[in-house]
Amino acid sequence: MSSRKQGSQPRGQQSAEEENFKKPTRSNMQRSKMRGASSGKKTAGPQQKNLEPALPGRWGGRSAENPPSGSVRKTRKNKQKTPGNEDGGSTSEAPQPPRKKRARADPTVESEEAFKNRMEVKVKIPEELKPWLVEDWDLVTRQKQLFQLPAKKNVDAILEEYANCKKSQGNVDNKEYAVNEVVAGIKEYFNVMLGTQLLYKFERPQYAEILLAHPDAPMSQVYGAPHLLRLFVRIGAMLAYTPLDEKSLALLLGYLHDFLKYLAKNSASLFTASDYKVASAEYHRKAL
């Protein structure tokens, strides 16, 4: 004890800093234990918050605003460890090589485990509409007929009639808001996916002609019920990549299935083979 005091008096402020660095070692150990215990508790908060049964705008999901609990935990650990280095610890007490070997996790990159565990979203097509999907395929791919465009009743008109039908049933305000969001989301997905995922190969020259004739028009104002129905065969795979939590996704699927029931109920007026016409010989040459 005497040798420590004699060496500390000439240093002045440095002796005080060394003593302050040595004193909190026990408290630092307690803090690390508390940190390990608290990290498990704090993860439950965001998960419960994301499970609120509310349909997000444009199906975006509240979880998009909050990073996954794993990334939050890693960020907190990094933030708590950095002050320890700034307080003046020597390299012998806090070895650097292990820290250099630890790679920082990028919160924007999905882990392999999360990708494998991603839920599969299945949209159930009503039995009444399945025969029409088969007939639509047969008319285009085997009989080489084309759905006449612009459609007599386009996708926008179908969605608007559905929304008006639901609102006329006396729904409360929050359900009316949800219907508006569902309709807007269906329209948005349709316009994005049509050119890449909703067309048969034989229809692509027709699509190119439509783009030239209507360069500024959204495809939901040009195409009709058959292509809208094709959307629901593909949309499940797309919904698996949205940041929606499980309850919000289940709520959304309920609205989508309700819309499909509406299509099935009105299938006689929405789906008819008379809307198709045999393609010309010139078109066949373009489609080769």
Curated annotation (Swiss-Prot):
Leader peptide range in chain numbering: none
In-chain residues carrying the UniProt-annotated modification Phosphoserine: S71
Domain MRG: 117-288
Gene Ontology BP terms: chromatin organization; DNA repair; regulation of DNA-templated transcription
Region (Disordered): 1-113
Keywords (A to Z) from UniProt: Chromatin regulator, DNA damage, DNA repair, Growth regulation, Nucleus, Phosphoprotein, Transcription, Transcription regulation
Polar residues biased stretches: 1-15
Main location: nucleus
Cellular component terms per the entry's GO annotation: NuA4 histone acetyltransferase complex; nucleus
Subcellular location: Nucleus
Subunit composition and interactions: Component of the NuA4 histone acetyltransferase complex which contains the catalytic subunit KAT5/TIP60 and the subunits EP400, TRRAP/PAF400, BRD8/SMAP, EPC1, DMAP1/DNMAP1, RUVBL1/TIP49, RUVBL2, ING3, actin, ACTL6A/BAF53A, MORF4L1/MRG15, MORF4L2/MRGX, MRGBP, YEATS4/GAS41 and VPS72/YL1. The NuA4 complex interacts with MYC and the adenovirus E1A protein. MORF4L1 may also participate in the formation of NuA4 related complexes which lack the KAT5/TIP60 catalytic subunit, but which include the SWI/SNF related protein SRCAP.
PANTHER family named among the record's database cross-references: MORTALITY FACTOR 4-LIKE PROTEIN, MORTALITY FACTOR 4-LIKE PROTEIN 2
Record protein name field: Mortality factor 4-like protein 2
Organism: Macaca fascicularis
Taxonomic classification: Eukaryota, Metazoa, Chordata, Craniata, Vertebrata
Gene this chain is encoded by: MORF4L2
